[in-house]
Amino acid sequence: IRDGACTMAALQDLGFHEEAHAFLGFIADRMAAAPLQVMYGIGGDTELPESTLDHLSGYEGARPVRIGNGAVRQRQHDMWGWLLHLMERDLVGRDVPVDDRSWADIQQLAAEATDHWRLPDQGIWEIRGAPRQFGSSKLMAWVALDRAARLAERRGEPETSEAWRTEAAAIHDDLTTCGVDDRGVFTQTYGAPALDASMLLVPLMGFLPGSDARVQATVLAIADGLTDQGLVLRYRPDEADDGVSASEEGTFTICSFWLVSALARIGKIDRARALFERLVAFASPLGLYAEEIEPATGRHLGNMPQAFSHLALIGAALDLERATG
């Protein structure tokens, strides 16, 4: 859900609206059949059992090779925000009213966000450890209710819009109270100091403006403290039990492009442009990116090509263009 919605939003940014509309139709069909889950097979499959293929190895002997995805049954409370964000952009971008089918889906997604945002989950990075109170999940729950309120207003449902705005305000207060540490930095989880690159989404999703001191502190803390040779890690494995491994991993390409966007939002244009140009130089001869980059060598690691990396490239380029006029 998350990856697909983010990809469709990037296509919308480039003027391709029909793809996003078709994707939302696919999701609406799934929602009509059964409760929404965090992922589906490309044909709408709901069962994606995970197993390892011990007779195979990946790039340079990497193991284990997995098929399926064990995260299919996880609790990931950010997904409603990504979908409602996309739905609002779709309806506004096509300049159409909120029809009855869309309204039913909006109500269902907003209800799920309302019912679950206070609960721990596995978060945007699909950790396999114990569920936690992830800041980015709270952020995207706020996005869900904020966008739902806008859509209710568009449909002419003022009472529902106000109720969702009230719930969004409660999430906003909770995250700014419990999700910010003594440095004024948004952290990975409530009550812990670990940084997480997903908190770069605070300004990118409109939760707070780039001029806010907490946003500036968070962006600079990540730029200075969650990087390897200037490229951004998701988090530090030794600070976050992800249930997989405590070993080192490469820098995440999407996170580095998020940092470009966030630096542009807080007015650090030269720093944003320098990072963007460095990242562009890492592209393959075909202009493609993998999931991760090894900073010392520029070697691409993980899934290749990775949609997440390219959609963040698009967002970073557009943010730089807007910031520089």
Predicted regions and their residues:
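Aromatic-lined, polymer-binding surfaces characteristic
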Residues: 77, 99-162, 197
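Aromatic- and histidine-enriched alpha-helix N-cap/loop-to-helix transition segments
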Residues: 1-6, 15, 29, 74-82, ...
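Heptad-repeat coiled-coil/leucine-zipper interface motif in alpha-helices
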Residues: 137, 164-167, 171
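A structural signal for alpha-helical segments
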Residues: 15, 97-101, 129-136, 156-163, ...
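Alpha-helical positions within canonical tetratricopeptide repeat
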Residues: 18-22, 105, 159-163, 167, ...
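Substrate-binding groove/exosite segments of carbohydrate-active enzymes
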Residues: 1-53, 57-67, 74-84, 88
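Well-ordered alpha-helical scaffold segments within catalytic/enzyme domains
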Residues: 4-18, 82-97, 140-157, 201-211, ...
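Extended glycan-interaction surfaces of carbohydrate-active proteins
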Residues: 35-74, 102-103, 108-121, 168-253, ...
